[in-house]
UniProtKB/Swiss-Prot annotation:
Belongs to the eukaryotic/archaeal RNase P protein component 2 family. The gene is rnp2. GO terms for biological process: tRNA 5'-leader removal. The keyword Hydrolase applies. Part of ribonuclease P, a protein complex that generates mature tRNA molecules by cleaving their 5'-ends. This is Ribonuclease P protein component 2. Keywords: Hydrolase, tRNA processing. Its EC number is 3.1.26.5. It comes from Aeropyrum pernix (strain ATCC 700893 / DSM 11879 / JCM 9820 / NBRC 100138 / K1).
Length: 123
């Protein structure tokens, strides 16, 4: 006999591709940026929302400042707002630009390709 989960379905996740533009030198490291994002999210939406959203950085290029953050689907607009509110990370002034929201990491990573790159439809 197969056991059923009583709690319901596993929450779906969305992946938001973003780019960090640093005004003071190189972009911050992954840990510095994740700490700044969590702090802004906590201040804007509270501890309960932060716990339910479970934001985490699944991909981050420290040289370019590009990355992907995973979040529970119901909180995707919260993470977009929090990304826009991040102004300091690792002691540097930064501006975070959300590029694309996707249902898969692979789809989010496509946002980093150049517009004429293969697989993007030449758009």
């Amino acid at each position: 006999m197969r056991l059923r989960r009583l709690a319901g379905r596993r929450p779906r996740r969305r992946y938001v591709a973003f780019e960090v533009l640093s005004l003071d030198g190189p972009p911050p490291g992954k840990g510095e940026f994740e700490e700044a994002l969590r702090g802004v999210y906590l201040k804007a939406f509270g501890a309960e929302s932060l716990a339910l959203a479970r934001p985490r950085i699944v991909y981050y290029e420290e040289e370019s400042g590009r990355g992907v953050v995973a979040v529970v689907r119901d909180y995707r607009y919260h993470i977009l707002a929090a990304l826009g509110l991040v102004r300091m990370a690792g002691g540097r002034r930064v501006l975070v630009v959300p590029l694309r929201t996707s249902g898969t990491v692979k789809g989010a990573l496509r946002a980093f390709r150049s517009p004429g790159a293969p697989g993007r439809g030449g758009v």
